[in-house]
A protein has these predicted regions:
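Extended, low-complexity cationic-aromatic segments
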Residues: 6-107
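Short helix-terminating capping/connector loops at secondary-structure junctions
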Residues: 19-20, 113-116, 143-146
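C-terminal anion-handling pockets and recognition modules
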Residues: 20-24, 31, 156-157, 163-228
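Acidic/histidine-rich, metal-coordinating catalytic segments
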Residues: 28, 102, 113-130, 152-161
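Short catalytic/ligand-binding loop motif for oxyanion handling, primarily in non-cytosolic enzymes
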Residues: 33-36, 75-76, 127-131, 157-162, ...
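RNase H-like polynucleotidyl transferase catalytic core
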Residues: 48-57, 140-162, 179
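Short, aromatic/basic amphipathic alpha-helical patches
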Residues: 130-143
Length: 228
């Protein structure tokens, strides 16, 4: 990782540290892959039991999820089934689905927080880059709480995003503990596991809390010589 990227991460951390973590929101997408349970389980007649898949082949069913958090809580996610993706003729979550999530779920959830101003932080996935469309989606639902929408520096999510470091990993482990599942229960399992997540320690791990050294996780401090 270059010294320049470390400086970009540090600059954004300084900006976000000036906000309360309860006013900094992260949004991202993840997925859970399921395969048929390898052992016999108790399910209703005609139902197939599933467990989290270790492979990524076409034989595993993928459930996509859009999720958000602020420093003290997670917000209601949106889960897309393999059938919904097939009907929409898409392989994953696209921009239209993201904007629909804002319209159906997120705008109302944001206003329910009753906090202003909020800052929304995203990685540089292609579906996130049209910031004007995102702002308009919130505006169309009379949601005015989000003042800023920021894109993280390239390849910075593992160091800056609580979702990538490492809420999504912990969430998948919670889902694994609740398997086996069926097609009727997997969305509830995914949602219930997500609502139990606690973002606060992950914000600290990402250097987003006040007075945290913005270079604390620099991979090469003696080479980069930050601040010298």
């Amino acid at each position: 990782m270059s010294a320049d990227l470390c400086e970009q991460i540090a600059d954004m951390r300084r900006k976000l540290q000036r906000c309360r973590t309860t006013h900094v929101m992260f949004l991202d997408e993840t997925a859970l892959r399921l395969s048929e349970a390898p052992t016999h389980t108790i399910v209703l007649p005609g139902e197939q039991a599933y467990v989290m898949a270790t492979e990524t082949s076409s034989y595993s069913k993928r459930y996509d999820m859009i999720a958000c958090c602020v420093g003290d809580r997670v917000l209601l996610p949106k889960i897309f089934t393999p059938t919904e993706r097939k009907d929409a003729d898409v392989k994953g979550i696209n921009r239209a689905m993201l904007l629909q999530f804002v319209d159906d779920v997120l705008a109302q959830a944001v206003e329910g927080l009753d906090r202003y101003p909020l800052t929304l932080v995203l990685d540089r996935a292609s579906i996130h880059k049209n910031l004007d469309a995102l702002r308009q989606a919130f505006h169309d639902r009379s949601s005015e709480s989000i003042k800023d929408i920021l894109l993280m520096p390239p390849n910075a999510a593992k160091r800056m995003s609580p979702l990538d470091n490492a809420m999504f990993h912990d969430w998948k482990e919670k889902c694994r503990l609740l398997c086996p599942a069926t097609a009727k229960t997997i969305q509830r399992i995914m949602s219930d596991a997500w609502t139990k997540m606690k973002p606060k320690p992950h914000y600290k791990h990402c250097g987003l809390t006040h007075n945290t050294d913005v270079y604390f996780d620099c991979p090469a401090p003696t080479v980069h010589q930050h601040g010298n």
